[in-house]
């Protein structure tokens, strides 16, 4: 069984703000793109494989996109970034499971990998002379995570009263960030 699809989601955002003497009245029209793929295969009634892919687009917040510098606190200045790009996350998940009824035995293995291009991270630039910092949202690459796991269950007696259940999960997250010193 194989299915796939693409979702195109139009989004209209209106933003009105008066801040630090700056009047902002803007509209953003975007289309978020989200492809999917799902593959399922049954080896038998009790044994199956599934692989799933999903892509997701996320837009930067309207406030992050505004070209406004807030220096009301000279030690903690914030800036917007009108050049921010949308982020796109891709995820792949796979799992395999099997159950043998005559032995009351079951096991499964599964895994997931996800990566995001153009993630949005706050870039903090520290000024050693003033002790102040400037924070500005920026796109960054290199964020990803992985997860694998599995379980095993079985009866150790013929009546199925005594069972052994065990599982193992491992995960790793890789997050990138910015830090600059002037």
Locations of the language-model features?
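Exposed, low-structure sequence patches enriched in small/polar residues
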Residues: 1-182
């Amino acid at each position: 069984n194989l299915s796939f699809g693409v979702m195109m989601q139009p989004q209209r955002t209106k933003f009105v703000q008066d801040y630090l003497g700056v009047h902002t009245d803007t509209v953003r029209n975007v289309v978020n793109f989200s492809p999917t793929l799902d593959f399922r295969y049954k080896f038998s009634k009790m044994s199956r494989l599934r692989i799933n892919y999903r892509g997701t687009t996320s837009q930067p917040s309207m406030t992050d996109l505004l070209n406004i510098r807030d220096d009301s606190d000279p030690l903690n200045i914030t800036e917007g970034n009108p050049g921010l790009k949308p982020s796109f996350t891709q995820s792949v998940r796979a799992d395999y499971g099997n159950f043998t009824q005559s032995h009351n035995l079951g096991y499964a293995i599964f895994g997931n990998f996800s990566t995001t291009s153009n993630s949005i991270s706050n870039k903090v630039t520290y000024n050693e002379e003033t002790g102040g910092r400037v924070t500005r949202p920026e796109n960054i690459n290199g964020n990803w995570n992985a997860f694998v796991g599995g379980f095993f269950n079985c009866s150790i007696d013929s009546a199925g009263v005594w069972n052994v259940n065990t599982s193992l999960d491992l995960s790793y997250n890789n997050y990138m960030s910015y830090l600059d010193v002037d």
